[in-house]
Structures are given as structure tokens and as C-alpha cells.
Curated annotation (Swiss-Prot):
PROSITE patterns: CUB (PS01180), LDLRA_1 (PS01209), LDLRA_2 (PS50068). It is found in: Membrane. The keyword Ribonucleoprotein does not apply. One of its GO terms (biological process) is regulation of neurotransmitter receptor localization to postsynaptic specialization membrane. Glycans are attached at residue 311. The modification Phosphoserine is found at residue 409. The lineage of its organism: Eukaryota, Metazoa, Chordata, Craniata, Vertebrata. This is Neuropilin and tolloid-like protein 2. The gene is Neto2. Brain (at protein level).
């Protein structure tokens, strides 16, 4: 009976042990799925005491064994012009392994997970004194699912930076060279460092860009420009891409050669880091990031034919957001219309006013060019004195009548009438011209001879005054006088019908360029 009771108790104890072990194994399996994903806050990673001169921290549950599958990160920051010294207590034990691949303590010289690695520590012997080169130190403790140990306890203190002791008060803060971008797409560019004066000329460049995609989206990265001043020298210049965080285990790609490929991230957070030492400041890059979701695509997204769905606002925007240019293939008509519309709205008035001014100036120029030669010809015609030129080469001659074109009709009519009267008077006086010769004596004889000479010197006369030859440059005057009768003092008074002496003076003036010629004809009978 007693033996049976003892067997029953043993069975219960065995079942209890199996149940506890099963629960422990299940818990370890669940914790193992969270490795590298969740960063445990410092409050859950043991004690951390901070002071103005330093502080101390320890692994979880120290001095008891640390739990499995734990990850704790400690970032130490000193004041400007100071560095950090880190020491460990003698009671120290972390699961030993080759190259500390399992449980380990990682220390980096800087504030980030990609800062230069100082070393990895594990085993039973505590590390020696660790000293930073700047005012930051990044420390990570990690444990796997089995073989836990005692852990560690570390102390840190701030010491003066020996590189600045001789400069007397010059501060040495770490360059705040961090940028954040988000949205459907955007540009990451290294020129932003100089534009915002994040670093001084001659200093090394160590900057990061944190990219956040739209909700439930991933990130696609494509280099638009990339050049390393010292190719294939990754210690001097490189561009690194991290997927999810800046932790070293999340490094996706690192470029330091002559070519940089596109990168497709699996999360919605991307970190871009650029490093260039003092002699590599000419290194540069420009990168396009695009938020995308995996198919099936919704009505608000565009299918890129490369397992990507991008926002409709990125289609035909002049930038290739897809891995292949599907989003910009059929946009020629749309681009032309958009460009014309933009020009019409913003510059239509300016273009119209400018075109009007140019048109007016063109018309004025044409008119000036057309009229200018005519003015020259008219000026030459006015300056050229044909009469004076002809007088130089032709012998002088006289004409009986020289009239202006405007007065020729009236003057010719009067002249024709007077000549007719003259001819009639001549015919009527011819029969009785010798009646009174005995009254005048020798004077009558001279008058007779004068009339005879006048008869023999018959002046040429043309009766076709209707169309005379125009005289352009001669300035002539024609003087008319009424018939007058002269008596000699030797002759007695006679009746009006006995008057036989009549004088008709006619003066013809022909003016040249400088002087005038005058001719007068007196006819007596």
C-alpha cells in the first residue's frame, strides 16, 4: 500500500516537471522569434545611473544570470571637449564563443550603430580600459536563447579631450548632421550638407538621412547621381543603406566603388549614411526614394509591372518612380498641354506685350528703310541745278519769251492779243507812212530807215501758244506798255489821225545763275 502511494507521488512530480519544461521551451521559442526586432529600453536592461561626471550600468538581473534573448543598447554622451572612459568590474561572465558570435558585448566609437567598431567582448575575463575618440560611445549587449551567464557591470567617466586642451575654450560638439524625409517620393542629396552648413570646409562628412514611407508602404531607392572621389577605398568614402534602423545588422548595401545599384527595402524606414574623410569632400550622391505597396493595386495607385504599386500622383510627373519607366511612357501629350497651360497663365501677358512692341518696332524700321532712299534721291534732284549746269557747257542764247508754267496761259493770251493789234496797226499805217516825211525832214528819213530795217528783221512768231515748251529754271518777266506817241520839237501839232510815230518798247530778261541778260527792241514808224 505504501509502495503504491509512493509511485503515485512520483508520477505527479514527473508530470509537473514535464509541464514546466514544456512551458519553458515554448517561451524560449517565442522569444527566439523576436531576436533583432525589439530593442529593450534601458529600464528593462538593468540599472543605469547617470551623473554629471559619468555613471554606471549593468546587464539585466546583475549579479544574477541575465535572461535569454535580450538586447540592450546604451548610448553614452559626454560634454563638449570631453571623451569617455569605460571600465568593467571583476565579476564578469558572458557566454564564451568563437569571435563572440553568440552572447556578446559590442562597443562602438560614436553615437550610431554604424560608428567605428572598437571591439566585441565575451568570456570570463573583463575587458580592459576602453576610451573613445569623441564625446559619444555606442554599446550593445545581446544574448541568445541558451547558456546564460553572470553578466557585467560597467562604469564610465568623462575626461578632457587632449586634442583641445591647447585651444583654450574652443568647443568640440559633434556635428548635428542628420536629416529626415517622408512622403510618396523625394530626393536625398549630399549637397544639402553644404547648403545647410552642417560641416565646415576641410572637415570630414558623416551624415545620415532617415526616410519614412507612407503608411503600410515600403521604400524603393534609385541613384540619380553617384561619385566617390576615391573609388574602392571604403575607409575614406562610402554610401551605406540600412533597412529598418541604423543598427549594423540592418545594413542593406554599402557602395564605395564606381557603380551604385538600386535598392528595394523591406520596411518603411530607410537610413542613408554618407562618410567622406577630409581628403574626400568631392564625393557626392543624389538618390530618389519612392513609397510603394505590393500588388494588388488599388484605384489610387498605379501598377509598375515590377511588383510595385505607386501613388497616382507620381504618374507623368517627369520623374521615373517605377523600376522601369512605365509611369512616364505615355505622357507626351499630357506634358505638352501642361507646359502650354503653364506658359499661358504665368507669362501670357509678358509675351503679348513683348510681341506687340517688337511688331511696332519692325513696322517703323520697314518704313524708315523704305523712305530713306527716296529722301536721298529728292535731295539730289533739288541740289542739282540743271540750268546752271547747262549754262556752263552751252553757249548763252536768248529767247523772246520765257514764262513760268503757272502763268503761261494768261500771259500767252495777252501776248497773242497785243501782237494781233500790232499787226493790224502796222498794216493800217503802211499806206500813209510817207505822207508826213516833209514835216520831219531828216528825222523822218531815219525813221523810215529804221522801219525798213525792222521790216527786214522780221521776228519769228509762232501762233501755237496752246502747248509751249515748259521752262523750269528761267525767271523771266514780260513788261507791257500802252501805246504812246512822241512828237519832235520841229514838227507842228497834228490831229490824232495824223500821228504816225508810235513806240512800243519790249524788254526781255533772261536770268542766269549769277547775272541777267537784257534785250530791248524799239519799233518806230
Amino acid at each position: 500500500m505504501a509502495l503504491e502511494q509512493l509511485c503515485a507521488v512520483l508520477k505527479v512530480l514527473l508530470i509537473t516537471v514535464l509541464v514546466v519544461e514544456g512551458i519553458a521551451v515554448a517561451q524560449k521559442t517565442q522569444d527566439g522569434q523576436n531576436i533583432g526586432i525589439k530593442h529593450v529600453p534601458a529600464t528593462q536592461c538593468g540599472i543605469w545611473v547617470r551623473t554629471s561626471n559619468g555613471g554606471h550600468f549593468a546587464s539585466p538581473n546583475y549579479p544574477d544570470s541575465y535572461p535569454p534573448n535580450k538586447e540592450c543598447i546604451y548610448i553614452l554622451e559626454a560634454a563638449p571637449r570631453q571623451r569617455i572612459e569605460l571600465t568593467f568590474d571583476e565579476r564578469y561572465y558572458i557566454e564564451p564563443s568563437f569571435e563572440c558570435r553568440f552572447d556578446h558585448l559590442e562597443v562602438r566609437d560614436g553615437p550610431f550603430g554604424f560608428s567605428p567598431l572598437i571591439d566585441r567582448y565575451c568570456g570570463m575575463k573583463s575587458p580592459a580600459l576602453i576610451r573613445s575618440t569623441g564625446r559619444f560611445m555606442w554599446i550593445k549587449f545581446s544574448s541568445d536563447e541558451e547558456l546564460e551567464g553572470l553578466g557585467f557591470r560597467a562604469k564610465y567617466s568623462f575626461i578632457p579631450d587632449p586634442d583641445f586642451t591647447y585651444l583654450g575654450g574652443i568647443l568640440n560638439p559633434i556635428p548635428d548632421c542628420q536629416f529626415e524625409l517622408s512622403g510618396a517620393d523625394g530626393i536625398v542629396r549630399s549637397s544639402q550638407v553644404e547648403q545647410e552648413e552642417k560641416t565646415k570646409p576641410g572637415q570630414a562628412v558623416d551624415c545620415i538621412w532617415t526616410i519614412k514611407a507612407t503608411p503600410k508602404a515600403k521604400i524603393y531607392l534609385r541613384f540619380l547621381d553617384y561619385q566617390m572621389e576615391h573609388s574602392n577605398e571604403c575607409k575614406r568614402n562610402f554610401v551605406a543603406v540600412y533597412d529598418g534602423s541604423s543598427a549594423i545588422e540592418n545594413l542593406k548595401a554599402k557602395f564605395c566603388s564606381t557603380v551604385a545599384n538600386d535598392v528595394m527595402l523591406k520596411t518603411g524606414v530607410g537610413v542613408i549614411r554618407m562618410w567622406a574623410d577630409e581628403g574626400s569632400r568631392l564625393s557626392r550622391f543624389r538618390m530618389l526614394f519612392t513609397s510603394f505597396v505590393e500588388p494588388p493595386c488599388t484605384s489610387s495607385t498605379f501598377f509598375c509591372h515590377s511588383n510595385m504599386c505607386i501613388n497616382n500622383s507620381l504618374v507623368c510627373n517627369g520623374v521615373q518612380n517605377c523600376a522601369y519607366p512605365w509611369d512616364e511612357n505615355h505622357c507626351k501629350e499630357k506634358k505638352k498641354a501642361g507646359l502650354f497651360e503653364q506658359i499661358t497663365k504665368t507669362h501670357g501677358t509678358i509675351i503679348g506685350v513683348t510681341s506687340g512692341i517688337v511688331l511696332v518696332l519692325l513696322i517703323i524700321s520697314i518704313l524708315v528703310q523704305v523712305k530713306q532712299p527716296r529722301k536721298k534721291v529728292m535731295a539730289c534732284k533739288t541740289a542739282f541745278n540743271k540750268t546752271g549746269f547747262q549754262e556752263v557747257f552751252d553757249p548763252p542764247h536768248y529767247e523772246l519769251f520765257s514764262l513760268r508754267e503757272k502763268e503761261i496761259s494768261a500771259d500767252l493770251a495777252d501776248l497773242s492779243e497785243e501782237l494781233d493789234n500790232y499787226q493790224k496797226l502796222r498794216r493800217s499805217s503802211t499806206a500813209s507812212r510817207c505822207i508826213h516825211d516833209h514835216h520831219c525832214g531828216s528825222q523822218a528819213s531815219s525813221v523810215k530807215q529804221s522801219r525798213t530795217n525792222l521790216s527786214s528783221m522780221e521776228l519769228p512768231f509762232r501762233n501755237d501758244f496752246a502747248q509751249p515748251q515748259p521752262m523750269k529754271t528761267f525767271n523771266s518777266t514780260f513788261k507791257k506798255s500802252s501805246y504812246t506817241f512822241k512828237q519832235t520839237h520841229d514838227c507842228p501839232e497834228q490831229a490824232l489821225e495824223d500821228r504816225v510815230m508810235e513806240e512800243i518798247p519790249c524788254e526781255i530778261y533772261v536770268r542766269g545763275r549769277d547775272d541777267s541778260a537784257q534785250a530791248s527792241i524799239s519799233i518806230d514808224f
